[in-house]
Design a protein with these regions (language model features):
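PRPP-associated nucleotide enzymes
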Residues: 1-190
Length: 190
């Protein structure tokens, strides 16, 4: 199943001011939380790249994105997104290296954080390669992490900023009720 945010502008058409307004609201929260810090925002391909770019513009922050593309001659840091249709993700190592000398906080930008596992894999990879050079945070429109995942992030001092907290515990059960052979379904009941 795929939960679609009707205001995001990725899966179904939306008036640009609706999507951009939502992105501005998230940028405001990030800006207040990390006021005065120089930030590197990393938008996750493919769905969160526009969100990350919009936040970076509003915050005056550095920006890069993960990718699934392969450019010859570029060194990447590879990690996996186990639940995705295309599991391999990567970031350009040279861009992280360049940020390491002048940026302290990396903010990972997502449309929705469900388990936090993909971001956690990238955090572990960056800590392995860069030690304590960076602190990490996550900014998302939706946060569906369960209590155990949130506690893991808190224990590791990874900040969380989001617009809406969601409960995904019943999604598989609810989605199973709607077999529509790939056709658009109306929103599920609460």
């Amino acid at each position: 199943y795929l939960v679609v945010n009707k205001h995001q502008g990725k899966h179904i058409p939306v008036a640009p001011d609706k999507a951009l307004g939502m992105f501005r609201a998230l940028a405001d929260l990030v800006g207040r939380r990390y006021q005065g810090e120089q930030l590197l925002l990393i938008g996750f391909a493919e769905t969160a790249t526009a969100i990350g770019e919009a936040l970076a513009i509003q915050l005056g922050a550095d920006y890069m994105q993960t990718t699934r593309e392969n450019i010859p001659g570029v060194e990447y840091l590879h990690f996996s997104e186990s639940h995705s249709h295309a599991t391999e993700q990567k970031v350009v190592k040279d861009d992280i290296d360049a940020a390491a000398g002048r940026i302290r906080r990396i903010v990972f930008v997502e449309d929705e954080v469900t388990t936090g596992n993909t971001i956690w894999k990238l955090i572990c990879l960056l800590r392995q390669g860069y030690g304590e050079k960076f602190c990490f945070s996550v900014a998302s429109l939706l946060n569906g992490m369960d209590a155990a995942a949130q506690e893991k992030y808190q224990a590791a001092q990874v900040g969380m900023v989001y617009l809406v907290k969601t409960d995904h515990s019943r999604y598989p059960e609810l989605a199973a009720q709607y077999q529509n052979n790939g056709k658009y379904c109306e929103p599920l009941p609460p």
